[in-house]
A protein has these predicted regions:
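Extracytoplasmic thiol/disulfide redox context detector
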Residues: 2-85, 155-158, 162-163, 197-206
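Sec/Tat-exported extracytoplasmic proteins
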Residues: 52, 67-70, 97-101, 114-118, ...
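Solvent-exposed loop/turn segments at secondary-structure junctions
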Residues: 52-55, 82-86, 113-117, 150, ...
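Conserved strand-to-helix beginnings and helix N-cap segments that scaffold or border functional pockets
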Residues: 57-60, 87-91, 185-188
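Extracytoplasmic/secreted envelope proteins and their assembly/folding machinery
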Residues: 60-67, 90-94, 107, 124, ...
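Structural microenvironment flanking redox-active thiols in thiol-disulfide oxidoreductases
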Residues: 69-100, 104-132
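C-terminal cap of thioredoxin/glutaredoxin-like
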Residues: 133-206
């Protein structure tokens, strides 16, 4: 009985120490103008990224593994930043791949093509040639890249990026208001540990 009490006390102290490990203002920040969340009881996590970002390429395996381990109370999505014309083209490529249901391996192939093969996919022609490798005819790629639906998504993402003041990638947004970003000396695993910490704080029963 006494041993069990000590065990409970130890676990409580351990949990508190873990929770106190990360602090608002030092390890993560809060935005001035948060985005509204869509569903009560669901913690929304968004990765702001760009295919041309070397850090995003390195982060991709870790964030994908992390996302696959989340339960039903966490919603995860990626948001390609549409800053410049090249960013917008890559963002349109991201949504085209999703719309055509080409799967995660195609997103990985984009990163590899850019960062390993040196093809930056900075023109529609190069993107059309790239997607031909996945059985997509150039005219179909054109239709999707220039579709009203995808342009709407780019406009939405541009608005959200401005509102959240996203200035670098990769960057994680939790529940539309908490920002976890890459910092010198911070590993990607540490970044995800901070995200986990913020998620736990945001869950209804926390």
């Amino acid at each position: 009985m006494i041993k069990n009490k000590f065990r409970i006390i130890f676990l409580a102290i351990f949990t508190i120490s873990i929770s106190a490990e990360y602090r608002l203002g030092r390890d993560y920040s809060i935005v001035d103008n948060p985005l509204p969340v869509k569903k009560d009881g669901i913690v929304e996590v968004t990765e702001s990224f760009w295919y041309g970002c070397g850090g995003c390429y390195s982060f991709e395996p870790a964030i994908n593994d992390w996302a696959s381990e989340q339960g039903e109370d966490v919603s995860f999505r990626k948001m390609p930043v549409p800053w410049s014309k090249t960013h917008q083209l890559h963002a349109a490529l991201y949504y085209t791949i999703n719309a055509l249901e080409l799967g995660p391996s195609t997103h990985t192939a984009v990163f590899v093509t850019i960062h390993k093969e040196g093809n930056f996919l900075q023109t529609p022609k190069r993107i059309k040639n790239f997607l031909k490798n996945f059985g997509v005819e150039p005219e179909i790629t054109d239709q999707y890249l220039n579709s009203f639906t995808i342009k709407q998504k780019l406009n939405r993402d541009a608005k959200h990026a401005r509102q959240l003041k996203i200035s670098s990638t990769p960057m994680i947004v939790v529940d539309g208001k908490y920002i976890v970003e890459v910092k010198q000396g911070r590993s990607y695993q540490e970044m995800l540990n901070i995200v986990d910490h913020v998620i736990e704080l945001q869950k209804p029963n926390s």
